[in-house]
Amino acid sequence: MLTWLNRNNLDFPPLEKALREPDGLLAAGGDLSADRLIKAYRHGCFPWFQEGQPILWWSPDPRTVLLPEELHISRSLGKVLRQSRYRVTFDTDFARVIKACAAPRSYANETWITGSMQDAYLELHRRGHAHSVEVWDQDELVGGLYGLAMGQLFFGESMFSRADNASKVGFATLVEHLTDWGFVLIDCQMPTQHLHSFGARSIPRQTFADYLARHLDQPTDADWLSRRV
């Protein structure tokens, strides 16, 4: 039976209570307050829902992740990176990045990054939990992504690209820095061919929960605002 959350209680049900069909649906309801979102990521679930639906919280099994040391750079992407066509920055325009990620895609008329979701993650950014990667072609924003950093874990949320390989350059650059800073895992949530091309793989939900327990409160050398690549 699906658990409905109380707005006055931030607790989530145990991850093993998630439904098998649809895979990983853990709870519904609640709100998108910063405190609840922080609690959700620390618990091992994330919000994903369409406009007009209740807030839905997910913890899929298996979970798609990327271990930074397993990053795979294709020959073609390596060539693009060596050409230094794009400039990459961190945390210089979070609002534009999340708005661009929310724009409808050619393969989908609707977006799950609703106005309320954008507001919620902007608040997380103001609190220092959510971060953005911007990819520039001169002064034009052509790609980027955003997610949350907690302890030695980075939780990827969404990316966009308006130029060839722009989001790939942003993601590869992010992983390089996360590796240098001491991060041990990037949560990719759900499998995609794009992520698998970088070396992402699926792990059991319990293994993901073990990573949370071991690394959520560990320090890193992260230095977001000084990074201009």
From Swiss-Prot:
Signal sequence residues: none
Q: Which Pfam families match?
A: Leu_Phe_trans
Asked if Transcription regulation is a keyword of the record, the answer is no
State where the protein is found. Cytoplasm
Q: Where are the transmembrane segments?
A: none
GO MF entry, a single one: leucyl-tRNA--protein transferase activity
Major enzyme class: transferase
GO CC annotations, alphabetized: cytoplasm
Per its UniProt record, what PANTHER family does this chain match? LEUCYL/PHENYLALANYL-TRNA--PROTEIN TRANSFERASE, LEUCYL_PHENYLALANYL-TRNA--PROTEIN TRANSFERASE
Q: What is this protein called?
A: Leucyl/phenylalanyl-tRNA--protein transferase
Q: Which species expresses this protein natively? A: Pseudomonas syringae pv. tomato (strain ATCC BAA-871 / DC3000)
| Source lineage | Bacteria, Pseudomonadati, Pseudomonadota, Gammaproteobacteria, Pseudomonadales
Question: Gene that codes for this?
Answer: aat
